[in-house]
Amino acid sequence: TPTRPVLLPDAPALIAGVRGVVWLSADGEVDTLAGQEVARRLQSAQPPIICHGRSFFARLGVKPFAVFDVLELYAFVRPAEFTLPTPRGLAEVLGLALPTSHEQEAESLMAAAHALISELATMPRDRDSGAIAWAMQRGGWRWAEPVLAALGAGEQPHSGSAAAGLAVWDRLSEWNDRGPETPPRDLPVEPVEARAQLVKLLGSGAENRPGQADYAGAVAPAFDARNKRGEPNVVLADAGTGVGKTMGYIAPASVWAEKNEGAVWISTFTRNLQRQLDAELDRLYPDPVEKIDKVVIRKGRENYFCLLNFAEATGRLRSGAGAPGEAIGLGLMARWALKSRDGDMIGGDFPSWLADLVGRGTTLDLTDKRGECTYSACLHYSRCFIERTIRRARGARIVVANHALVMIQAAMGGEEGQLPTRYVFDEGHHIFGAADSAFSADLTGFEAEDLRRWLLGAEAGRHSRSRGLAVRMEDLIAGDDEAMAALDEALRAARVLPGPAWRQRVAGGEAVGPTEEFLSFVRQQVYARETGGAATYSLEAGTESPVPGLLEAAGALEAALIRLRKP
């Protein structure tokens, strides 16, 4: 029973269908309306309750307007918990009756809002939740009033106190450095052990699949100790659809990991398989607390929530440099960060639909996509999600990673000079393509822009931690005229790379410098010859018969890059 007020907006619930909009008034009346009638009614009504604003507005064919989006409320009340971003998906996770018509979907949205506010009203008092909600209220969050009432958050705090509610880094625990791990032993996995483990993992009610048991026994020799330097034991195993390959190799891998007190790294190509493995490993470690210690999903840094990026975003908000509405997205991110298992925003427990609702700037763009990590120099290093995951992996039994990360680590000798001794490569047919991707370089506008920023540092009006080569080198070469002259030459050469607003200039035919000139001609050729029609997310064209000027621009860019590369 709720212990605090459960307030709901006196607003209609709207569902946009193919044939019109279902309008469920707050007092229960249902109408199906055309677009013009909806617009007329909205002029005198409360902002409506809807689900997934972006798709709702797209279906109506209108510009966004003020709404109560139930998904935003769900992201606040149940951060890091999965739901499909639909009325039916919400009903399913909240234990409500599943809707089978648009009218029932509208009813379901109202019921979902009531259930979520009621859930808040029964939670133990939580200072963090109230502080975050107050910060979001200052940004104009529609749900703020019922949420604050349900939380019993009291009077509005000073603006500084409200902004401090977003300082999640102060509430995250610090990770502890583990001591050096004892090298794993080399006890073998007998085929009979692999088969027995498979039976245990599948349980007594599982379908009898002899091929799966044969597979588990056949791959067990891959875990034997090597007999010659540089000659690991390799089992190349293939099996048809339906055999159950995943559990077939998890069984011997888990036996080896426990017997030898070491980690087996399972390398995949796709995120879907990583998610599948994460779910399958619940069989091995049904206790969630034990699983956190024993299973780690490793990814590149660009996949994880960066606390420093988040702190800088909240700092811009406090200083007035950010738009007030950004507080809504940042507040929902704060809620998620406090509940997330590992801070993984790409395929982890981050709800991907949240970026559709509040924008990439306060969600996905908070990852470290630009390689600007300052590592131990960062104020939040001891609470960093990435560093925490790296340390957890050192003591784990099963580590799931992707081919690219595994190969890069192998090429660089591993973290602290230590490499895993046992690997399973699933989706092995992608290894060569993954290697090409991991060890190749892209000649793109974004890559060139990053290189310019690394060399010159942040330029006028740009939010970046890049200090530039001059700042990094000045203490080392102070007083050395020859070195200073070489530095000046390098910085002049770097200006051939695309600067701020290069995309607008390239698209507008106002390219500046050899890189932008080259990209402009490439863009011209792609747009002139692509055949994908409306498929604007994947434009491509052949390299044959280059458009006039492209080869000359390529030659000029090559000369400029050679000059930049010279010591």
Each PLM stretch: what is its role?
Residues 418-439:
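SF2 helicase catalytic motif II
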Residues 380-390, 401-419:
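Conserved RecA-like ASCE ATPase "motif II neighborhood" in helicase/translocase motors
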Residues 237-249:
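Glycine-rich P-loop/Walker A and Walker A-like loops and their local beta1-loop-alpha1 context
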Residues 72-73, 102-185:
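N-terminal accessory nucleic-acid engagement/regulatory domains that precede
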